[in-house]
Amino acid sequence: MCIRDSILAEAGFRPIVIERGGRVEKRTCDVQKFWESGILNPKSNVQFGEGGAGTFSDGKLNTSVKDPSGRNRLVLETFVRFGADPSILYDNKPHIGTDVLSEVIVNMREFLVDRGATFVFDTCVNNLDIVSQKLLSVYTDSDSNSNSEIKTDVCVLALGHSARDTFDMLYNKGFDMECKSFAVGFRVEHPQRMIDESQYGIQKKIILPPSPYKVTSNFPNGRGVYSFCMCPGGYVVNSSSTKNHTVVNGMSYHDRNSKNANSAIIVSVSPKDFGADDALAGVRFQEKLETENYKRGNGLIPQQLFGDFCDDRLTTAYGDFGSCTKGNTVFAKLNGLMNADMEQSFKLGMEHFGHLIHGFDRKDAILSGMETRTSSPLRIKRDESFESNISGVYPCGEGAGYAGGITSAAIDGIKVAEAIIKKYRPDFK
């Protein structure tokens, strides 16, 4: 959300950015250690830390958000300003890559510090002082200073979608929240060469980049099945942030040079699947899947070939290609993680996509479990001024339920910054 904070700083505000994880330099070391050893730091990982979950992703910057006001362009120009390749300004499917994005984030932070912003790392918001539906203070907790108070009447909640303890705190504080639909599934790998041949043709020229794809299907049972966060030349990564939970995601570097393409193939779920309708029902649904997934792999990424998945059989060896992962893997049965209706929809989706991309439903396509954090399972409600039912608190971005990626989250952050400026600095143009 540095773009949001940049706008506030330029309007004369001095934002305090509270980050529960570490600086990106330290965070990168923590993540690499986890991938190599399996030792998870719950405070600094693929989900938590400077830059959020997007830091360890493909770094996609395309968005379906229609924004004629130019905020989308501002987001791209800001990334270029701080070190991204200028090609993102004209590329139809712009992406930064996790290696470049990490450098951009540091440049953004240093710029903001020079303009009066304060960054507080390895610190979690654990309470809010609210009187008569108005914010008075924010309380934080860190290893060096527990229950520290920051007096303020303005707080932007840019949580990310994995801050479940914070969701609990907000729910218990009386924030108006609701559960919402999202999607879960498996990360699926294919040889990048196969995808290139299907998308470009057999005589793919070397000047062409690794090909992306986007596939979607809807079925009579009301479920949608579609690709999400497709990573050409990428890696499947263990993106767990909670002990005894296993979650996967996709990531690629700027040059997208791994041998495999991967994407989450996910199945839509709605509140009727959760068995409850309170705001945290979707969170509990995710946790149930992630803990069972952890058990299947004993903390490693559980994998199964698609053909074996269809036959309900344990995989014992890869087929014609191996897996490109960050994090250790183990063969395990993924059958039964999703309910029967969802599992059947996943299989039908894969078969349908095989008609769109030759070989997509090949028997040795590699499934990794599970992809559960495609978007926030809840929404923190806000009014037309972007405030929640608690005056001074502004829910923002993906975790609050108003975005679905780097660019859309940045656009939402800009909107929130504009609302704050309008209320507190109406003279600023």
Language model features with spans:
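Residues forming the flavin
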Residues: 3-429
